[in-house]
């Protein structure tokens, strides 16, 4: 009798296989009381645990909250909506998602996941996962597991292989940032391009990673290694634009040429001088007077004046002309300062001597006779009487008139009469 009373006053404890005291609960499960007198059940791995109201095994954490072990033997607890979670280092709840990845809510209540690189990221409101970088900016992950950010203007952008941000604008076009932090887009044909400085010009990148621009007239042009812009015409032929916004193309011989206002091909020679090609595909350039300058097969300059007379240049850079009668017209280096803009001829049919054409009213020829007078030029009227140049001025030349009005003999006679008159007066 005394033994039975003693058993009623003290809870009945049964020893288990390991000689631990335990008592059966209402459903005849062995348990032992914890420090608070709550039932603690041993699990399969010989860990003490207790049962909650819905008969789930759990154990209390430091704050007395229930902590449940997960499948990977990690402690986790249940929140108010009965979702299993575990506290992180800061004591914030960390939930496993559907992919068994732990996540925790941030300050805004959004979920933050750790990625493979142990960086925290959280899902966006439209269920897109994003990260927070060192600057606190949102970093997203797309379907291809590529990183993309969201800047202050709510534009999505990615990080490419070179860790350069790639944006997507409102039209869902990919927007890159180049080395100079300029935006570069991807159009419908997946060709990357950017926006120029203030002119809203489209800048493309081709397969060779060269910039391809598109100006206001929708002509694409490139930037070569020397940062010179060259365009692509309708036939996908590259052509350049110089600093005067003139278009020029490289031809088959890799010579650069452009197209002027008349859609004529304008070439650039080795000296970066403009020369064009006329309707007969003959290259020519424009001189200071906008006169066409041609090149012959021997790379000699062939000019054409207003009267459509071809003008040549020999190897010594001496200009020589040819009129309709195929007579050559030279310009001598020694007398270029004297005879400016005055063509002079060699008449092979008569004298085989160079002669000039005066621009005065009379169009009178004047010669350079190298056999006489030490290469001093002399002029001739129809009677071919010479007039000599001295100190860049002819003796019979009047300043206010651009023609020769007196002959040399008459000039000497006048001086003689003047001297005789002075002697007579004295």
From Swiss-Prot:
Subcellular locations according to the entry: Plastid
Keywords recorded for this protein, A-Z: Plastid
Region named Disordered: 17-114
Plastid listed as a keyword: yes
GO CC, any one term: plastid
Protein name, as recorded: Uncharacterized 51.9 kDa protein in rps4-rps11 intergenic region
Source organism: Euglena longa
